[in-house]
Curated annotation (Swiss-Prot):
Subcellular location, record wording: Cytoplasm
Chief location: cytoplasm
Name by which UniProt lists this protein: Elongation factor P
InterPro entries attached to this UniProt entry: Elong-fact-P_C, NA-bd_OB-fold, Rib_uL2_dom2, Transl_elong_fac_P/YeiP, Transl_elong_KOW-like, Transl_elong_P/YeiP_cen, Transl_elong_P/YeiP_CS, Transl_elongation_fac_P
Database matches in Gene3D superfamilies: 2.30.30.30, Nucleic acid-binding proteins (2.40.50.140)
Amino acid sequence: MPKINGNEIRPGNVLEHNGGLWAAVKVDHVKPGKGGAFAQVEMKNLRNGSKLNERFRSADKVERVRLEQKDQQFLYETDGMLVFMDTETYEQIELPADLLGDRRPFLQDGMTIVVEFYESEALNATVPQKVTCKIVETEPVVKGQTAANSFKPAILDNGVKVMVPPFVGQDEMIIVNTETMEYSERA
């Protein structure tokens, strides 16, 4: 594994630190008037989700880990486990449902997601950034409400609540940004 200097850490980097695997969430490079520069790094443990704030000097060496990314197709759910098929080898694997976190409701039958592996251990899974969903409940369209930049609540077919523009009605298909959990556009 390559070692990098403390000032080379960027958000999204995966580091091996204190015997664990950590993803750099936020990195602030600080140059105090007195003393050497350092990077203040907010990290999240990829195995248990705990957070840690750590300070790395420019001269500190830290191991950067490369995760292997594989496309996996969702097949079905059983006993709190999600069953996926590798799109290249057609091998099936079971992953815990909590690996997707709050993006779990956006997982649809047959959807291809990206799973990150480290030494054959699944550490992270991400659904596509934009997913098409159907609105099952929202207030009816009222003419004349489009003058102001206003939004109304809507419940999607997966149970997620999002704010949508007033011109979007019930039973319409919309595209939702899964990172921000916000309405993106009509489908």
